Amino acid sequence: MIESQVSRAKARPYAGRGNYVGRATDNLSADLQVGRVARRAPQLRTAVRSDARKIHELIQRNQQVGHLLPRELSELTMRIDRFVVGVDGRGSIVACGELAPLSASLAEIRSLVVSEKRRGQGLGRLLVDELKVRARASGYDDLCVFAHQPAYFAHMGFSIVPHTWLPEKIMADCRSCPLFRRCEQFAMVTDLDAVPEVQPTAQLHV
């Protein structure tokens, strides 16, 4: 009798520990799964109208650090199908970039933004590469960007040129900019002939 009671007493805490360990393991597995989803490499796609507010918020949050020009929500909504967005495993927009037409042969990358937590992971380069492919597929010969940090884009094949080499940009935007005569941005251009003719991730209208 005593031996059986001792056996039951020993078994009870062991069973409890087993159940606890089992629950803890299940919780840990669930947490790891959520972590894997959050860390999953963002997917690129063409923005849709419902993305406009999130893109606007992303640009506003990074306006100072990224030296970004302000954008109105109404403008973004009107031009939403020019944007490519990076979406993480939870469906949040963590990056964006716009392919803006300047002429029949020249397009510009605008509002290139990567959220702070996603920087340093190559997402900006993925966006630029995707915008290059889309520009080539749309029939443009050259792609330009105006940047405060030219080295970043130089590593992706862009070259610094005089602003006057881009009269389309000057006519479209620069003349109305309050910093027109004291612009601190570098004008940069890349020739799209070297970009492979592959299908873009999703259709982009420009």
Give residue spans per PLM region.
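Short amphipathic alpha-helix that is part of the acyltransferase structural core
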Residues: L32-P70, V87-D88, S92, Q185-A187, ...
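Conserved beta-strand in the GNAT
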Residues: V85, S92-P101, S105-V113
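Short, low-complexity intrinsically disordered segments enriched in A/P/G/S/L with frequent Arg
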Residues: S7-R12, G16-G18, G22-R23, A30, ...
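A short helix-loop-beta-strand connector motif used in the catalytic cores of GNAT acetyltransferases and
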Residues: E75-R90, E108, R181-E184
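Short, P/G- and charge-enriched loop/turn segments at secondary-structure junctions
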Residues: R71-L73, A172-P178
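Conserved active-site alpha-helix within GNAT-family acetyltransferase domains
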Residues: A137, D141, A147-R175
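A generic "binding-loop/recognition-motif" signal
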Residues: D51, S105, H148-Q149
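Conserved acetyl-CoA-binding loop-helix of GNAT-fold acetyltransferases
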Residues: V114, G120-A135, V145
